[in-house]
From Swiss-Prot:
Gene Ontology MF terms in the entry: RNA binding; structural constituent of ribosome
Entry-linked PROSITE patterns: RIBOSOMAL_L15E
Organism: Methanosarcina mazei (strain ATCC BAA-159 / DSM 3647 / Goe1 / Go1 / JCM 11833 / OCM 88)
Protein name as it appears in the record: Large ribosomal subunit protein eL15
Origin superkingdom: Archaea
One GO-annotated biological process of the protein: cytoplasmic translation
GO cellular component, one term: cytosolic large ribosomal subunit
Amino acid sequence: MVKSFYGYVRDAWKNPDETYVNELRWERLQVWRKQGSVTRIERPTRIDRARSLGYKAKQGIVVVRVNVRRGGLGHVRPNRGRRTQKMGKNKVSGGMSIQRIAEARADRKYPNLEVLNSYWVGEDGKHKWFEVILVDPHHPVIKSDKNLNWICDASIRGRATRGKTSAGRKGRGMSTRGKGTEKTRPSIRAHKSRGK
């Protein structure tokens, strides 16, 4: 079977450090660093990934690039007495992943749009960049699209802030079931955050 154009793009992005993507990314990051934290773009950088997540080149769909800090939660060591367990030096689990933070920021920037999904496009020593696909639930083109009109329902509002996107469901532990995930349902907080 003949491989499609999207297949070649996908293969190049699987190992971006070893393909032509590396050189392109080096040039792009120089421009992206000078842009704002949420920047609307004309078309997706990774067209294969965007289309697999539901992107279509039609009215009512917007793509933005979001710049978020890298790294875990910084935690200053307490200078008073603590149990070792409560010092939080070995590990402090963040409530949201970096990708979820990017989705939430895009959601706040465009309050009339709804987050469909997001994907990684680059990183350096300080920042990570994600592209977030946003959909206008009130646009007639979206309302008439049988694949996307589910997002027009009132119950779907605020997907990104409620952890209903792919990154959100993964962070809440909804991607696995059964043994080992007893503390993630009905929610993380219902089990005193032991599921994290």
